[in-house]
Regions:
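A residue-level signal for conserved active-site and pocket-lining positions in enzyme catalytic cores
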Residues: 25, 134, 155, 188, ...
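Generic hydrophobic, helix-prone segments enriched in Leu/Val/Ile
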Residues: 11, 15, 99-109, 116, ...
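Active-site gating loop/helix substructures
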Residues: 113-120, 166-231
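A conditional alpha-helix N-cap/helix-loop micro-motif detector
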Residues: 4, 124-127, 216-219, 244
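Short, well-ordered, mixed-charge alpha-helical segments that flank or form enzyme active sites
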Residues: 159-162, 194-198, 244-245
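Conserved nucleotide-binding/hydrolysis micro-motifs of P-loop NTPases
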Residues: 28-30, 158, 192
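Ligand-binding beta-strand-loop-alpha-helix segment within the catalytic cores
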Residues: 76-168
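SIR2/sirtuin-family catalytic core signature
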Residues: 1-22, 28-32, 37-38, 42-43, ...
């Protein structure tokens, strides 16, 4: 049995015994058209600064998110700074939360804070196979006997709650008693449901200050829930990049505890596209510029005897370096994650996720 098969077998056993916890990241919600946190911040920032001129574009949120993505590829400003500037723009907490709700669910609304807020569970699952597979795992659960023990989500949205429909669940975004017989869904960064009646900013983690405040409070309900779950059940992380600093800190703390942990993460295998001839030529020219710099500095005086600029072997040399770095990079990522007590389950295509999740129920 290879490592991946062993991981899936462990997840199946945990599900059968009712001891499997799910950790959901932005990758789960993007399949339904919701923005990731970085695009959410920029889209809110753009529309806040140009509210009147951008109002017609609220009818076409895809353009706002596409522009945010374009800006992300070119901006050097840390998003934490942008988020802080955005928050300072709003004097009224209610206005900020309404704008966050409108931007988060822009694809569900008609641009005027109304729209399709009554979504059929079947429709939302068929349009997002990963969410559909997660929903099936939750629906197959019997509290205390089999299935999912709890869901910890780092997303604001209520897509899973909508998909679960009449299955008994409890959405939790602050310290509160657990309801017996209901699947707990912990929103540790806050909860902004689609069918909203009241939004409170103190319940969400949005700015860098709020993030640090949440991270440093070791006894906050959110941190305690995560530590208890990471150390007391088998965990599967879905749609998470594993780059969240607070989560890595918690994983590191749990890995030092005198308990046996069993956590897994579904991660896309890094793909390094081979450079095209033009890119290879640019890399070669850059390498030559370094050699010339060495010669001028006097650090290397015999490079011409060991390096032939007319030799075409540099193509293979560059490609072999890239391939070796790629191979070692995957191994190193696996090693670092396992040091944190997380066993990666690599996949090549996102279409594999629903299949892997479905196999847990088999």
């Amino acid at each position: 049995m290879n490592r991946a098969d062993g991981s899936m077998d462990s997840l199946r056993k945990a599900y059968q015994s009712g001891n499997l916890s799910l950790y959901l990241g932005a990758g789960v919600s993007v399949g339904s058209g919701l923005p990731t946190w970085d695009k959410l911040v920029l889209a809110m920032y753009f529309s806040a600064l140009s509210k009147h001129s951008l109002h017609p574009w609220q009818l076409y949120p895809s353009y706002l998110f596409a522009t945010a993505e374009w800006h992300l590829e070119r901006s050097n400003e840390p998003l934490e700074i942008t988020a802080r500037k955005l928050r300072r723009y709003y004097k009224d907490d209610d206005d900020f939360m309404l704008h966050l709700w409108e931007t988060l669910y822009a694809g569900f609304l008609d641009g005027f804070s109304t729209g399709n807020t009554a979504i059929a569970p079947l429709a939302i699952c068929s349009g997002n196979p990963t969410l559909g597979a997660i929903t099936q795992l939750c629906r197959g659960s019997v509290s205390g006997q089999q299935g999912i023990r709890s869901v910890i989500t780092y997303n604001y949205d209520s897509l899973l709650e909508i998909a679960l429909a009449d299955h008994p669940f409890q959405a939790i975004c602050k310290s509160m008693p657990l309801a017996r017989g209901k699947l707990p869904i912990y929103h540790v960064h806050g909860y902004v449901p689609l069918n909203v009646t009241e939004l409170t900013e103190q319940d969400i983690v949005f700015t860098e200050d709020q993030y640090h405040q949440s991270a440093k409070d070791a006894y906050s309900w959110a941190n305690l829930v995560q530590i208890q779950s990471l150390s007391g059940s088998t965990g599967l992380m879905i749609g998470l990049s594993m780059s969240d600093r607070n989560m890595r800190r918690l994983l590191d703390a749990v890995s030092q505890m005198p308990v046996e942990t069993n956590n897994y993460a579904l991660l896309k295998e890094p793909v390094w596209k081979k450079p095209d001839p033009a890119e290879l030529q640019r890399i070669n020219e850059k390498a030559l510029s370094y050699f010339y710099r060495y010669e001028v500095s006097g650090l290397k005086t015999d490079w011409e005897t060991r390096f032939n600029t007319a030799d075409d072997g540099w193509h293979e040399q560059i490609i072999s370096i890239i391939e070796e770095v790629h191979r070692v990079d995957v191994d190193q990522q696996t090693f670092i994650l396992e040091q944190l007590g997380v066993h990666p389950i690599w996949f090549k295509d996102y279409d594999e996720i629903p299949e892997k999740l479905a196999s847990i129920r088999a």
